[in-house]
Amino acid sequence: MLRNGNEGMSTIPGFSQIQFEGFCRFINQALAEELNKFPAIKDPDHEIAFQLFAKGYQLLEPSIKERDAVYESLTYSSELYVSARLIFGFDVQKQTISIGNIPIMNSLGTFIINGIYRIVINQILLSPGIYYRSELDHKGISIYTGTIISDWGGRSELAIDKKERIWARVSRKQKISILVLSSAMGSNLREILDNVSYPEIFLSFPNAKEKKRIESKEKAILEFYQQFACVGGDLVFSESLCEELQKKFFQQKCELGRIGRRNMNRRLNLDIPQNNTFLLPRDVLAATDHLIGMKFGTGILDDDDMNHLKNKRIRSVADLLQDQFGLALGRLQHAVQKTIRRVFIRQSKPTPQTLVTPTSTSILLITTYETFFGTYPLSQVFDQTNPLTQTVHGRKVSCLGPGGLTGRTSSFRSRDIHPSHYGRICPIDTSEGINVGLTGSLAIHARINHLWGSIESPFYEISAEKAKKKKSRQVVYLSPNRDEYYMIAAGNSLSLNQGIQEEQVVPARYRQEFLTIAWEQIHVRSIFPFQYFSIGGSLIPFIEHNDANRALMSSNMQRQAVPLSRSEKCIVGTGLERQTALDSGVSVIAEREGKILSTDSHKILLSSSGKTLSIPLVNHRRSNKNNCMHQKSRVPRGKSIKKGQILAEGAATVGGELALGKNVLVAYMPWEGYNFEDAVLISERLVYEDIYTSFHIRKYEIQTDTTSQGSAEKITKEIPHLEAHLLRNLDRNGVVRLGSWVETSDILVGKLTPQIASESSYIAEAGLLRAIFGLEVSTSKETSLKLPIGGRGRVIDVKWIQRDPLDIMVRVYILQKREIKVGDKVAGRHGNKGIISKILPRQDMPYLQDGTPVDMVFNPLGVPSRMNVGQIFESSLGLAGDLLKKHYRIAPFDERYEQEASRKLVFSELYEASKETKNPWVFEPEYPGKSRIFDGRTGDPFEQPVLIGKSYILKLIHQVDEKIHGRSTGPYSLVTQQPVRGRAKQGGQRVGEMEVWALEGFGVAHILQEILTYKSDHLIARQEILNATIWGKRIPNHEDPPESFRVLVRELRSLALELNHFLVSEKNFQVTREEV
């Protein structure tokens, strides 16, 4: 957080800062921590010792560029060099050796793994430590339990039963006496009684037999092992038994870590040193003491709130990468031990590098990381839909993943908003559906304390003494456990000056409660009007007038907006658009001042301090979401520029600001039922003038392989049996030419796969060749890459990737231009979404009093029930801004200045626009914001005045071109023999229970029979029906049941229920008991 000289002013931190800070901590600290844990590998028989040292490790610059890594499907990584020492007899060798490659974060805060941009999102978990809770059993008796959570996520419970005996539950099934556990951890009975506050309770429950079991540590360990492992018989104490117990129990359930040790000391008022990160007998006894105090009413009856952020910690990218590095070093240790054994078998002299160099050992590090990025739930494909998604994705926090919650079992309480989220986690921005409340987004000013894993929020410190001494106020970052001790003034006091504030009573937050107190009692106050919202929520103007559910939809839908070919910044915004675009990395920013020498579509040449710098531009590059990423130069040749100036703009940015949609003229009125149920009526102007036209790039690839007979596949233009029309775009190598326009079913890459013909298929000449010369006749199968349905477009790039002579991959990139059409989804910034239902000629659209036709018609019934009135304020103010040629940037919650501030602003601007343009219809006092408009078909005015305005409308990525789908025949499910589900699998349309009811209601028995049998899972009938249809024969009526019925019968048989069916003839409708 940077502070200006102005009092009460602060700048917003970099939105991608959290990812960069996490990765820097991994490189600077975590690598050294894990290398320090690497044990010395000794082989006493041969007097050899190998060791790695953390001091002075080095990371080389990546050997390839980012763009090459993406195109060639490689990992953008850096080689790690570490100091190593090898003692072989009396020979000591020291060497700096390479132990493998580590993926490197790029300037977007992402990683490139096998050519794909991936990002690691932050995980929020219960912090290690101890948590107490009380609950009532079925008899209404209070049961008190204490849960100890380890750093690995393992749980142990302390509980007091009805007989007032204290147990430790180390798993769901086994419970062990607290005395046995303490003795097994190294305490004798005398030490236990000396270190507890209630020794009489500890002495009351062990009988003579139990006292014998805890006479010594060895007996206690045996007893503990028997109960923990459920082993009977006589056991003998041994070192292997101790090691097994250490591995299965103590390592998993007793390692608290640095954070757990701090939490345990705080909760139980202990003073155990921070470097002692394991659970000690003293911890267990203090935890038991506290539990006894809760049970008998002598302690504080305070249940721990598991959903409070002070009891949570963030596992950032640093923690997750550190775990994987530790895992890779463990594998490296085993690999080096095997290599040492092989060295002695071959009797060769080893060096530190030769112990690590074998191929399998040197790639251990990078394969571990590639597996992690490919399979770990918190490693996600980077969302590159638009600049907003690129900025927001790295700020996500998730409760899901290993050690966390699950979408199906999480309670409402764990999903709900908590008072401790204020200024840390956005109360609005979360996913819809099963994961609602489990994935969130960090507030714009929140930062992560990487040392303790807590989320901190900034506040201004208010102190009368400090204010007198110096005019500036200090910004303090408070963690969730600290802000409980402060009186925090709410954001509505921001507008008041110091003199007025001292006389006022202000609303404040204290210990999760809201109070009204005098200004003198305030300790800290908020620093920003919307510091408790995420980036998505902060981009919604007039958010305070919207229902929270609609604001949630809006913040999600802004991330689905497609970058348009001609972007336009919003008339009404919140002021955060510039920072969001800047931190997304899509624009090119000058890193130093200088003079522009030349610009073109690929690069900008800049002269600075006597040097010429070449700044590359992104030119029609495909994103992960198939959008077109393109940068356009914004500086002319010869212009002098300063550091920080925008040189080129990326997709969906204009003038350095985020520009996701278009300002279009909208009317809220019904129109012939075409905007029923959220449908949207649009003007053909939006199509012909390319208002909502977007470009998309599809990637198609094909790879050559070696067949089972050892023959290599071949890329060629010479493909027999194919029409010349399909091959018209191929060059002499058999690959489509750059710039070609391709249609569905055209060949993009010609490929032949050799096949050995079977003897029965030989023609006479082939048999003769084989008999005389012994030559095998081979045939080739055409396996070319063809353009699928809906893929038509222009070829903009072709890439050959050849790793060896036989392994060739060809990638073809095709650019598509998509205008807006019926079936596309559009949305505003207030959760007002809809599907295009009809594109009307502009002369038929309703028009204003000055003759301007409306661009979009929304249903007015979508506003009152959804309670998203912000769209009305936005559209009216947008109209005023369009007429006055103004842009507005309004912070939310402007009612803190005065009542009805939003309404007053909108009406005053409309009145000014009416005066300026001399158009009285812009602001009519009888119905402000509304106007009389005319039907374009008849020229008659509509009966009621209609609300008109300029709204910022987005085109979303849910486009009809990617949704529409048809199937004639295709794959069937193996079990039910019904068509599979989904567009990607060329699946069928499901006719469910309710659809069958509808067809039954119309009495269409034959259609129903076709849908449920012939077209679906009647195996014999569906083969014969095609032939019958072609030849005009009668459709056969088969008597055997469809496959799904047979599956049902088998299911019942597996439950020991026999189900038979009999055909009753038309003549005799009765079946006797004997026949059955």
Swiss-Prot record:
- Key words of the record: Chloroplast, DNA-directed RNA polymerase, Nucleotidyltransferase, Plastid, Transcription, Transferase
Question: PROSITE patterns annotated for this entry?
Answer: RNA_POL_BETA
Among InterPro entries, the record links this protein to: DNA-dir_RNA_pol_bsu_ext_1_sf, DNA-dir_RNA_pol_su2, DNA-dir_RNAP_su2_dom, DNA-dir_RNAP_su2_hyb_sf, RNA_pol_bsu_bac, RNA_pol_bsu_CS, RNA_pol_Rpb2_2, RNA_pol_Rpb2_2_sf
User: Which terms does the record give in the GO molecular function aspect?
Assistant: DNA binding; DNA-directed RNA polymerase activity; ribonucleoside binding
Q: What class of enzyme is it?
A: transferase
- Catalytic reaction annotation: RNA(n) + a ribonucleoside 5'-triphosphate = RNA(n+1) + diphosphate
Which EC number applies?
Answer: 2.7.7.6
Q: Which GO terms describe its cellular component?
A: chloroplast; DNA-directed RNA polymerase complex; mitochondrion
Q: Name one Pfam family in it.
A: RNA_pol_Rpb2_6
Family label = Belongs to the RNA polymerase beta chain family.
- Quaternary structure and interacting proteins, as annotated: In plastids the minimal PEP RNA polymerase catalytic core is composed of four subunits: alpha, beta, beta', and beta''. When a (nuclear-encoded) sigma factor is associated with the core the holoenzyme is formed, which can initiate transcription.
Q: What is this protein called?
A: DNA-directed RNA polymerase subunit beta
